[in-house]
């Protein structure tokens, strides 16, 4: 028999509310257009008193105070405060929409659409006066929102790394900085693509399923092609196919590819990942250095509007050109070890002295890396 879904007490209550909404003739999941015409961040930045707006978002907090209530909704651009007044929403004697639907049947996590007008509270906070609202999506599971005590200490935050990775959709809702990372990643890829396209480099797509896994040393994922009755491998690299295109007559090709490696994993190593590979004919690694400098500077400027960033309490400049130094010189500069004439056993001894984790499979090259 299939395993029965375990439902928490909160989830039971939300399901009961769902049925109550249906009894009132309210569709909790309407497949209809809701004509959003603005976003939270724009309304805050370009505040205009009494401006009529239509917005939508997820309820993230509520403060119910009798016939009037404040709440906060979150859309794709940020959060904004909204103000519910019973008599503004319910113009007739029937106060069900406020007294029952809003106060009793809505929960944090529900998505609502709002029609209203802009104003500022006495303390100057930009707020939407709700004139009408529509339930767009009833959430059946509570959000893992943190609790804050009177002294501002936060508890029960959604910080477990394993859970965050497995439930990215929840992570995006409750940790706003994660959404910023997604947005920056897209900006980075778009900037790189534009940079290479401006130089007339050709973006291509190469096979993901390959008869021979090549281009790197890694353990592949294996599958089977039923029609041909042959084993195939998810690519570990797109290098060989890109080089074949150069052989075929293209002088500059690149690809953003999804590669797969059936090996160990941690927060920095995923079994599937995106990689950029670029091949250009008639160039050398000095030319590639210059291209890389220009590319990284361009990306940093486009994403951060400046070429200098703060990381781990340090200021890092991505303004080209960069210092060029050999790996042997770099090791000597930062560790005071001259490894230019060292053998494998001597390199291994230095790694142990510096508490660098190594194993017996590593040769001179890996130890230097």
Residue ranges: model-predicted function:
Residues 1-369:
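Class II aminoacyl-tRNA synthetase catalytic cores and aaRS-like
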């Amino acid at each position: 028999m299939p395993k029965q879904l375990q439902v928490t007490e909160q989830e039971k209550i939300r399901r009961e509310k769902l049925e109550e909404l249906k009894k009132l003739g309210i569709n909790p999941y309407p497949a209809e257009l809701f004509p959003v015409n603005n976003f939270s961040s724009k309304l805050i930045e370009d505040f205009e008193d009494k401006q009529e707006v239509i917005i939508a978002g997820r309820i993230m907090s509520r403060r119910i105070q009798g016939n009037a209530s404040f709440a906060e909704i979150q859309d794709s651009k940020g959060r904004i405060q909204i103000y519910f007044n019973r008599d503004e929403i319910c113009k007739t004697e029937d106060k069900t929409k406020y007294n029952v639907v809003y106060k009793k049947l809505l929960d944090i996590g529900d998505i609502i659409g709002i029609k209203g007008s802009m104003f500022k509270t006495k303390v100057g906070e930009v707020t939407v006066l709700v004139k009408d609202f529509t339930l767009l999506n009833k959430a059946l599971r509570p959000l893992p929102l943190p609790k804050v005590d009177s002294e501002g200490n936060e508890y029960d935050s959604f910080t477990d790394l394993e859970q965050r990775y497995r439930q990215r959709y929840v992570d995006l809702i409750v940790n706003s900085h994660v959404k910023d990372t997604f947005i920056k990643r897209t900006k980075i890829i778009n900037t790189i693509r534009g940079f290479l396209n401006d130089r007339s480099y050709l973006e291509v797509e190469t096979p993901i399923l390959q008869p021979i896994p090549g281009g790197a040393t890694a353990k592949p994922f294996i599958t089977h092609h039923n029609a041909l009755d042959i084993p195939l491998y998810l690519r570990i690299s797109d290098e060989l196919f890109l080089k074949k295109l150069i052989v075929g007559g293209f002088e500059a090709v690149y690809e953003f590819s999804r590669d797969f490696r059936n090996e160990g994993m941690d927060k920095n190593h995923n079994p599937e990942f995106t990689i950029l590979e670029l091949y250009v004919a008639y160039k050398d690694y000095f030319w590639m250095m210059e291209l890389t400098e220009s590319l990284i500077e361009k990306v940093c400027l486009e994403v951060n509007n400046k070429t200098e960033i703060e990381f781990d309490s340090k200021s890092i400049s991505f303004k080209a050109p960069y210092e060029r130094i050999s790996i042997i010189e770099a090791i000597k500069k930062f560790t005071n070890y001259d490894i230019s004439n060292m053998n494998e056993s001597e390199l291994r001894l230095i790694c142990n002295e510096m508490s660098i984790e190594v194993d017996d499979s590593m040769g001179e090259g890996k130890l230097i890396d």
